[in-house]
């Protein structure tokens, strides 16, 4: 019987609530499909700072490195915003990405037919949307050096560096090509090459790598136009390839196509070693403990972990089917309420999904 080691980072806010549902799902699937899961929970984010004065303790990172996959819920809380930057929960995410060399972030954006009425977009605009954002994750302006703050007399100055080398761009392009070859063989690379030298290198490198592929359709788009096109006609996109900063922004914009950011999973991957699978949404401390959070993005992230991280394809598909069945029966959490459905709590919608497996 196959055995997998999974590290759970339930984190902060609504994290423990949505994690509990995913763990129950995993336990049921492991029995159904005949594999063993060794699930070890570790401190991460704000809770890790409270316990260890570090949002990403060495023990946690070591356990993640030794695992087959990492399942992460969410981190953060406004109460940590006054801490030094390196102690904030969000800094833990950057440390985790660096420690595991997670250079590729994969965010699928797919509209479920039963949720067409829950989106703020018109039905005819989004009904065929099925795209993937491939975002470079450990380069660009979030990691570039030098960075910092300077005080000159009474004037404060802050600066960051947006930097990529051709190797970083090549490897993320290869990930996008691999995904595109399994889909429509169509990639839209997003940059700002009309004003940024780093974006010109991005465009040149992506074009060079893509030119070696047969039957691959590559287009280029400036990021401001890409944002407009995602709202105007999101169905035109299949695989969007972009840098760290632009991907962060565009993927959240694309999230609203689905009706709620509570519907979007993601995977962060390296060339070797474990990936991290997490919902796109934040920790939502304002609703933590109220049992009203949407656990579906976490469940879909669990599905991605099974499919990509553990190669348990049937088990992964089982989650997707269960979620579609629950939604098609009119069950929703409050963030998806369109006035014509049965609103359930976080635990209730989780139980419905578990029953469908």
From Swiss-Prot:
Entry GO terms, CC: cytosol
Top-level enzyme category: oxidoreductase
Enzyme Commission number(s) from the entry: 1.1.1.85
Keywords assigned by UniProt, alphabetized: Amino-acid biosynthesis, Branched-chain amino acid biosynthesis, Cytoplasm, Leucine biosynthesis, Magnesium, Manganese, Metal-binding, NAD, Oxidoreductase
Binding site for Mg(2+): 224, 248, 252
Recorded metabolic or biological pathway in which this protein acts: Amino-acid biosynthesis; L-leucine biosynthesis; L-leucine from 3-methyl-2-oxobutanoate: step 3/4
Compartmental location: Cytoplasm
Pfam families given in the database record: Iso_dh (PF00180)
Cofactor remark from the record: Binds 1 Mg(2+) or Mn(2+) ion per subunit.
InterPro entries listed in its UniProt record: IsoCit/isopropylmalate_DH_CS, IsoPropMal-DH-like_dom, Isopropylmalate_DH
PROSITE patterns associated with the record: IDH_IMDH
Site description Important for catalysis, residues in chain: 142, 192
UniProt-annotated binding residues for NAD(+): 282-294
Keyword Cell membrane: no
Chief localization: cytoplasm
Cofactors: Mg(2+); Mn(2+)
Molecular-function GO term, any one: NAD binding
Any one Gene Ontology BP term: L-leucine biosynthetic process
Quaternary structure annotation from Swiss-Prot or TrEMBL: Homodimer.
Record-stated family: Belongs to the isocitrate and isopropylmalate dehydrogenases family. LeuB type 1 subfamily.
Purpose of the protein: Catalyzes the oxidation of 3-carboxy-2-hydroxy-4-methylpentanoate (3-isopropylmalate) to 3-carboxy-4-methyl-2-oxopentanoate. The product decarboxylates to 4-methyl-2 oxopentanoate.
Protein name as annotated: 3-isopropylmalate dehydrogenase
Organism, as annotated: Prochlorococcus marinus subsp. pastoris (strain CCMP1986 / NIES-2087 / MED4)
Protein's gene: leuB
């Amino acid at each position: 019987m196959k055995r997998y080691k999974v590290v759970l980072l339930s984190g902060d806010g609504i994290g423990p609530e949505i994690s509990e549902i995913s763990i129950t799902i995993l336990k049921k699937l492991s029995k159904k499909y005949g594999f063993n899961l060794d699930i070890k929970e570790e401190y991460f984010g704000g809770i890790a700072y409270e316990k260890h004065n570090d949002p990403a303790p060495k023990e946690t990172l070591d356990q993640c490195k030794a695992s087959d996959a990492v399942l992460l819920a969410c981190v953060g809380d406004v109460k940590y915003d006054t801490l030094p930057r390196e102690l904030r929960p969000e800094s833990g995410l950057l440390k985790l990405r660096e420690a595991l060399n997670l250079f590729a972030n994969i965010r699928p954006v797919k509209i479920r037919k039963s949720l067409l009425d829950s989106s703020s977009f018109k039905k005819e605009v989004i009904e065929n949307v099925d795209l993937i954002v491939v975002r470079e994750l450990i380069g660009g302006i979030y990691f570039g050096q030098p960075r910092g703050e300077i005080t000159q007399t009474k004037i404060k100055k802050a600066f960051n560096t947006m930097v990529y080398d051709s190797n970083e761009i090549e490897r993320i392009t290869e990930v996008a090509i691999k995904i595109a070859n399994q889909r429509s063989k169509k990639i839209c690379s997003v940059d700002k090459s009309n004003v940024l030298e780093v974006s010109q290198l991005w465009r040149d490198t992506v074009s060079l790598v893509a030119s070696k592929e047969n039957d691959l359709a590559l287009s280029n788009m400036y990021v401001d136009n890409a944002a407009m096109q995602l709202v105007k006609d999101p169905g035109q996109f299949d695989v969007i390839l972009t840098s760290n900063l632009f991907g962060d922004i565009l993927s959240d914009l694309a999230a609203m196509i689905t009706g709620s950011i509570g519907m979007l999973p993601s995977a962060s991957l390296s060339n070797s070693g474990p990936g991290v699978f997490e919902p796109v949404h934040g920790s939502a401390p304002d609703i933590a403990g109220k049992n009203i959070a949407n656990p579906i993005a976490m469940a879909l992230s669990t599905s991605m972990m099974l499919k990509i991280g553990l190669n348990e394809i049937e088990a992964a598909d089982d989650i997707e089917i269960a979620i579609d069945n629950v939604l098609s029966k009119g069950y929703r959490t409050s963030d998806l309420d369109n006035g014509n459905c049965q609103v359930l709590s976080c635990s209730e919608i989780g139980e419905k999904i578990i029953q469908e497996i």
